[in-house]
């Protein structure tokens, strides 16, 4: 039987632990376990939302689904601004391997140098970073084909402006977030923008979408904006102004074309301009919509309102005489002068035709200042045009209670107040019809568009633009008889020997008034000029009103008859042909006075009563007509492929001078 083996008892087991030590160890373990339980409870309760959000950030993402921004269209449906599909390229910078050779190809496709790309990926402590926004789809597909870990893309839209600088001041532009910054894009931001949708998705480590979490919230697209603009006439006006500014070495220029029947704006052109799709061309000078925001003294173009007030009062007729033979007129300590001294008495009609400051001032001072102010206020002087456009200027027209006699006199011929070109174009609507001032319109209301669309459909698909040409009722300002008389006076004024070959439009009777004013700087007039011409055609039934302004011509001439009248002729001729308006006069004509009694001085030719207002064929400088385009030429050059109205001028002298031409 084997012997039993004795084992030595471990000393540690034989030792008796002190009671306080065992209790301490138990308490320590209890506290540690309790802390773990409390922490677990805290994480499952108070910190649960935070932890879930942090976890979701690593695999969940809410993608904003952009609404398709509404289009901006002209009256015929031609697109002036639209949104095209594009992609935004982004990266999780902490997941991108900076040594990956494919980053060189990525930089090339993004139009960046590799150093700039690496700087974007390493800049700051941000994990998510946009590399480039609004990348075209073809480039985005080639980037996706690189399959670089950590690089992804989202769908978005890129704003497109097919007309470029031609309609830039009208449509404006948006920023990268599709928020309007200028023009109609800014003014109608809420209408055009719509409401974005959303999509919650799960992504993998490379940023690729695995699945959707919730139901997709669809975006609500923005509504289209339809303008009264005719893009063909807009192009013609833009090119005419641009070329005139270059030819006259001017600072800037603008033109407005209105439908004489309803006040709708057919064109609103400015130069200098900018390309809304290329932000590198943006600068303060090019951004200014001068036809609406820039103010100037209208000069002689305002004299017709003084004449209209005089005629409408019943105290004067077109044959009423005014003495301006001295060439100057003292009003207290002040003196006003005519640019050219007149040797004979002037009829009211001749006061406008010869642009006499003295005759106009005498006319105005014979009437109460309140009546004069009410006339100017009624046609919109001193009030911002309500066309829904940002920054439309109100101009300056002091209350008549503060007018001194000299101020009343100077206001009568367009000094001492300020206007915008659009205000003046709208004011001339009282002469185009029955004496009513028409509201200027730029936006075709959506309700009217729906009604017109139904009418067009009922007519079997007639041209959409035709439905918006109906005449509208305005606010009466002068009697219809006065408006008719003023049309004759405007026709005589535009047909005088100073302007016949500059403002004339072959085949059409035109009427209008030139203006030439010095600019006011620091409270004093300086030798910088604004040349203008405002007129309408055809005078048998006015269809368009065209206003032209050239700022600071620098090629030696500055009279409105020299600078602005030819631009008026070109725009008016092309617009009338585009609108298919029938000619109302022979190609070589000069108008006769309104009636035999208005002819003052030797050489008068009496006519039969039935000949009043009839056009007579007489010998005048020939005009060569090159038929203008009915639409915009497809060439992008300003000098090629664009038919134009060419007028050859012979033996012409400048129009009347200071205070108006």
Please annotate each region the language model reported.
Residues 1-279, 295, 370-382, 504, ...:
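Periplasmic/cell-envelope proteins involved in peptidoglycan metabolism and beta-lactam response
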Residues 2-6, 81, 203-216, 255-300, ...:
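Beta-lactam-recognizing serine transpeptidase/beta-lactamase-like catalytic domain environment
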